[in-house]
Amino acid sequence: MDKLLDRFLNYVSFDTQSKSGVRQVPSTDGQLKLARALQQELLELGFEQVVLSKQGCLMATLPANVAWPVPAIGFISHMDTSPDFSGKNVNPQILENYRGGDIALGVGDEVLSPVMFPVLHQLLGHTLITTDGKTLLGADDKAGIAEIMTALVRLKKSQLPHGDIRVAFTPDEEIGKGAQFFDVKAFNAQWAYTVDGGGVGELEYENFNAASVQVKIVGNNVHPGSAKGVMVNALTLASRYHQQVPESQSPEQTDGYQGFYHLHSMKGSVERADLHYIVRDFDRNGFEQRKQTMLDIAEKVGAGLHPDCYIEVTITDTYYNMREQVEQHPHIIALAQQAMRDCDIEPNMKPIRGGTDGAHLSFQGLPCPNLFTGGYNYHGKHEFVTLEGMEKAVSVIMRIAELTALRAKP
C-alpha cells in the first residue's frame, strides 16, 4: 500500500456519499467505515496521536525529526463524496499515456471528450483515472487523502527535515458540516492547508460567501371547475418567483469573481410549492444584497394575496469568504507558492467557486488555504484525476513541510 495509486483506488472503493438533511454527523455510515480504515492504516504506519472522534473526524501526527522549534502545520482532506451523484460501486478506469480524443466511460455511450472538457488537450501523455460513466470518481477528496497519506509515509522514510505535521480527515464537507465538530485546539497547528483543489498549481485562499434560501409558497386548492377568484396556484406563484431571479446571474452564465443565484431543487402542487436556492458572492456587500433580493422578490410576487396564502423565505448563511482571515498571515501563501516553484509548478492563484472546510476553520482561528489535488470535473460521471498531478501534490506537501522547518532553523 505504499503506492499512491493503490491507496487512491482503495479509498474510492468505500461508498462515502454524504446526505443532506440528516442531523447526525457523519450523515452516512460509509464515512465512518473509511475513517476506521484510515485510522488502522495510520496506526500500522506508526503515526502518533491517532484519534477518531465520534463525529468521524480523524486526526494524527507525524512527529518532528529536528531538534529546533518548528511551527506545527496541518494538512486536511474530507472523506465524503458529493450527494449530487452516486458514489456507490465506483469502478475506476486507468488510461495510461493518454493520446487525445474521446475516452469511453464503461461500455455505454458515455465519453470524456476534449470538446466538452478542453483541459484534456493539456494532459497528453498522462495517466488518467476516470469513472465508468455510472458514478462519480471520488477524487474529491480521496485524491487529497491519498496524497496526504503518501506524503507522510515518504517524509517518515526520508531524511527531509520537518516539524510536527498534523493531519485530519473530515466528514460531511460536501454538505457544509465538515468543520462543525473539528477541534481546532486539539489539532494544535499554527496553520493548515486543505488538499481539496483541482488542477495542478491551483492555490486558493478566497471562497464564496454562501447562503441557503428556502422559499415556501402556500396556495389554495379548490376544484378547478369552481376556482375563479378562489384558487391560488402555488406552482404559478413559484414560476413567477423564479422568473424574477436574474437569469444572467446563474451558475451556467458566471465565472471568476462573479456571484450567482442557483435554483437547486423545486417541488410542489397547487396547494404548496417549495423552492431551494443557493446564493453565492465573493464580496460581503454583494452577498447581503443578493439575500435582500430574494426577500424583495417574495414581497413583490406575494403582494395582494389572501392572508392564508403566502410566500415565506428562510435564509441561512452557510460559510463566508476566508480571504479576510488568511490575508492576515501572508507567509502561509508565500510558503505554498515557494514550495510549488521548487517543484517546477507555477502557482495558479484563483478564487474557489465553492467552499472548503478551510473556510470554516479559518474563522475558527486556523488559517487554511487550499492546495490542488490534480482532479477535474468533480461531482459527476466525468470526474477524473491524473496520476502525475497527484504525484505533484505529494511533492508540494512534502516541500511545504521541509520549507517550514528550514525557515525556522536558527
UniProtKB/Swiss-Prot annotation:
Keywords: Aminopeptidase, Cytoplasm, Hydrolase, Metal-binding, Metalloprotease, Protease, Zinc. It catalyses: Release of the N-terminal residue from a tripeptide. Its EC number is 3.4.11.4. PROSITE patterns: ARGE_DAPE_CPG2_1 (PS00758), ARGE_DAPE_CPG2_2 (PS00759). Its main location: cytoplasm. One of its GO terms (cellular component) is cytosol. It holds the Pfam family M20_dimer. Zn(2+) 1 binds at H78, D140, D196. The active site is at D80, E173. Its cofactor is Zn(2+). The keyword DNA damage does not apply. Disulfide bonds: none annotated. Zn(2+) 2 binds at D140, E174, H379. It is found in: Cytoplasm. Belongs to the peptidase M20B family. Cleaves the N-terminal amino acid of tripeptides. This is Peptidase T. It comes from Pectobacterium carotovorum subsp. carotovorum (strain PC1). The lineage of its organism: Bacteria, Pseudomonadati, Pseudomonadota, Gammaproteobacteria, Enterobacterales. The gene is pepT.
